[in-house]
Regions:
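Phosphate-coordinating catalytic segments in nucleotide- and nucleic-acid-processing enzymes
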Residues: 1-65, 69, 128-161
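Conserved D-loop-proximal element of ABC-family nucleotide-binding domains
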Residues: 77-81
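C-terminal lobe/lid and adjacent interdomain/linker elements of RecA-like ASCE P-loop ATPase modules
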Residues: 85-161
Length: 161
């Protein structure tokens, strides 16, 4: 596994008194809790919180790809908002890949609105009269979205005219 990702996972799990381990025999990620000296409790990957599973997936995808187009559908789904910012910040800092992200989260959108306009394109999608309608937001509209902040998803009709 990638050293930077390993270290970040160690830090995150350490905050909860847990240790992230990679079982080289089974090739599985596990979480370990030391109950007392010489006694451990192993938690299989599928049993850890959805937020942590998803964060590991997205971070591994970002770090293990280069010169790729990565498509993430609703990375905020089943995740605790503060942890999602750990993923969005990795996306923002990555200059090795191109990203396509669908979201219904104002937290995700607000993180990306910090990007310069030449690094960001926002497309709004609607369903009208049985047809899908897609519109790219202009730079002016993106600036307005930045100013609306959390209210963006309550004002989408403003941008879908």
């Amino acid at each position: 596994m990638m050293p930077k990702l390993k270290e970040e996972l160690r830090t995150i799990f350490n905050d909860y008194g847990l240790k992230y381990v990679f079982d080289t025999n089974s090739q599985e990620i596990k979480v370990m809790k030391e109950k007392k000296p010489g006694e451990i409790f192993l938690i299989p990957f599928h049993s850890i919180a959805d937020t942590l599973q998803r964060m590991i997936f997205y971070k591994a995808a970002i770090e293990s790809n280069s010169k790729s187009a990565l498509v993430f559908e609703e990375p905020e789904a089943h995740s605790y908002p503060p942890f999602i910012s750990k993923v969005t910040q990795d996306i923002i800092q990555s200059d090795r890949n191109q990203f396509f992200i669908t979201t219904h989260s104002p937290y995700v959108v607000n993180d990306f609105l910090e990007l310069p306009s030449d690094k960001l394109a926002i497309y709004l999608v609607d369903f009208r009269n049985g047809e899908t309608f897609v519109k790219r937001a202009s730079d002016t509209e993106v600036q307005e979205m930045y100013e609306y902040g959390i209210d963006l998803f309550f004002n989408t009709e403003t941008f879908l005219r």
